Amino acid sequence: MKVTLIAILTCAAVLVLHTTAAEELEESQLMEVGMPDTELAAVDEERLFECSISCEIEKKGESCKPKKCKGGWKCKFNMCVKV
């Protein structure tokens, strides 16, 4: 009887510790609300400008499609599109 009780209490303690650790990990991986939005907006504007300029330059001889924007973005319709 004592062994069963000890086993149940041990399992409960392990479960609580595991759940707490999982919650802490999840909280550490969450994005902060305020700052990243403004950073993303600035990056998007920069990519749009960069792509528009490269498209304008390349349109003089060939199509814009072979030119790719940096970081997984592609130039399409004179704008950067996420690939």
Swiss-Prot record:
The protein's job, in short, is: Lethal neurotoxin that blocks neuromuscular transmission.
SUPFAM superfamilies, alphabetized: omega toxin-like (SSF57059)
The cysteines joined by S-S bonds are 51-64, 55-75, 69-80
Pro-piece positions: 22-48
Chief location bin: secreted
Recorded hits in InterPro entries, A to Z, give:
Hwtx-2-like
Q: In which tissues is it expressed?
A: Expressed by the venom gland.
Q: Which UniProt keywords apply?
A: Disulfide bond, Neurotoxin, Postsynaptic neurotoxin, Secreted, Signal, Toxin
Q: Does the keyword Disulfide bond apply?
A: yes
Please state which protein family the record places this protein in. Answer: Belongs to the neurotoxin 12 (Hwtx-2) family. 02 (Hwtx-2) subfamily.
Q: Where in the cell is it found?
A: Secreted
Report the source organism.
Cyriopagopus schmidti
Q: Where is the signal peptide?
A: 1-21
Gene Ontology cellular component list: extracellular region; host cell postsynaptic membrane
Protein name, UniProt field: U1-theraphotoxin-Hs1f
* GO function terms (MF aspect): toxin activity
Q: A single Pfam family, by name?
A: Toxin_20
